[in-house]
Amino acid sequence: MGRVRTKTVKKAARVIIEKYYTRLDNDFHTNKRVCEEIAIIPSKKLRNKIAGYVTHLMKRIQRGPVRGISIKLQEEERERRDNYVPEVSALDQEIIEVDPDTKEMLKLLDFGSLSNLQVTQPTVGMNFKTPRGAV
């Protein structure tokens, strides 16, 4: 099993990533040199632990946002996604096909007056697997 990382290592790595994200990489040796240049770390062992955790977090950041780390690039990307407005509205189509349940939901949301709604029967026969032991 691996070792438990102390809060000192985790906090230092998070701060380093937030401030020096552009200089860091997925390579431990590169991150070790960057940590050595930018921070005063008292021991070689602690520096290596911090660099290792920085490398670990950088790999996680590549896959998606990481809790506790706010990077300007990720913040801008999130803003762009939140402010996205489609060029053509989904309601501006000539015919919108909905099933009866969706039609009822639209009525409850005061969208029942849309003229281009066409109620269609849902297709039966979806082959969903049932859990073992279910009747």
Curated annotation (Swiss-Prot):
It holds the Pfam family Ribosomal_S17e. The modification Phosphothreonine is found at T130. GO terms for cellular component: cytosolic ribosome; nucleolus; small-subunit processome. There is a cross-link at K103 (Glycyl lysine isopeptide (Lys-Gly) (interchain with G-Cter in SUMO2)). One of its GO terms (molecular function) is structural constituent of ribosome. It is found in: Cytoplasm; Nucleus, Nucleolus. PROSITE patterns: RIBOSOMAL_S17E. The modification N6-succinyllysine is found at K19. The modification Phosphoserine is found at S113. Component of the small ribosomal subunit. Part of the small subunit (SSU) processome, composed of more than 70 proteins and the RNA chaperone small nucleolar RNA (snoRNA) U3. It comes from Bos taurus (Bovine). This is Small ribosomal subunit protein eS17.
